[in-house]
């Protein structure tokens, strides 16, 4: 008796399921990194929106703005986005803090900074891990890595290549 088999055998189905599982295991971490980078890009975009106000304040007053109000921008809690809790200007350093909910777990509550230094009569901007500047006075361009930033730094793999400057960059 010759029977004609139609469809897939159990072994064939198990092999297909195993292949799909392996592909999902490889793709999921890459997707998580992609979503974190996309969320960090919102923080950079909001922080970069404050650069012109900080630069203008510096060029007009000869010192860095001490806070959001003196820079002429909205308060830190008013500058926010879907993934960004706040953007603060302090002594010319613009720091964005990620939100603590609806954000990739690897970047929850973490920070990044944009800061400027005088260079040949103009202002050059840098972007990277959180930094602080002690004083707003024009003679002080130095920034230091934020002391309380341990555990609050965004992993370098989630920062775009244009935002990986060290605090001692010049």
UniProtKB/Swiss-Prot annotation:
Residues 1-7 form a propeptide. It comes from the Bacteria. It holds the Pfam family N_methyl. Keywords: Cell adhesion, Disulfide bond, Fimbrium, Glycoprotein, Membrane, Methylation, Phosphoprotein, Transmembrane, Transmembrane helix. InterPro entries: N_methyl_site, Pilin, Pilin-like, T4P/T2SS_Core. NCBIfam families: IV_pilin_GFxxxE. Belongs to the N-Me-Phe pilin family. The pili are polar flexible filaments of about 5.4 nanometers diameter and 2.5 micrometers average length; they consist of only a single polypeptide chain arranged in a helical configuration of five subunits per turn in the assembled pilus. This is Fimbrial protein. It comes from Neisseria meningitidis serogroup B (strain ATCC BAA-335 / MC58). The gene is pilE.
